[in-house]
């Protein structure tokens, strides 16, 4: 049996953990999701311009699909950027 050697254990790297947004339960009405409603869509986009995941937004899968298609349509229409600079 091997002996415990503390030198072989590498130092752990501190990786920042992204937590859920506080008060992210925004009243989500199905009829308000539209590609022209840029103020609502910006809440579901990260600072880099990426669509946030369901874990962060706490949406159902159906709501997430509606949001993602609206964001993609708004990007094609030129209302939202593909990449934030």
Curated annotation (Swiss-Prot):
It comes from the Eukaryota. Keywords: Chloroplast, Plastid, Ribonucleoprotein, Ribosomal protein, RNA-binding, rRNA-binding. GO terms for molecular function: small ribosomal subunit rRNA binding; structural constituent of ribosome. InterPro entries: Ribosomal_bS18, Ribosomal_bS18_sf. Its main location: plastid. One of its GO terms (biological process) is translation. It is found in: Plastid, Chloroplast. One of its GO terms (cellular component) is chloroplast. Part of the 30S ribosomal subunit. HAMAP family: Ribosomal_bS18 (MF_00270). NCBIfam families: S18. This is Small ribosomal subunit protein bS18c. It comes from Tupiella akineta (Green alga). The gene is rps18.
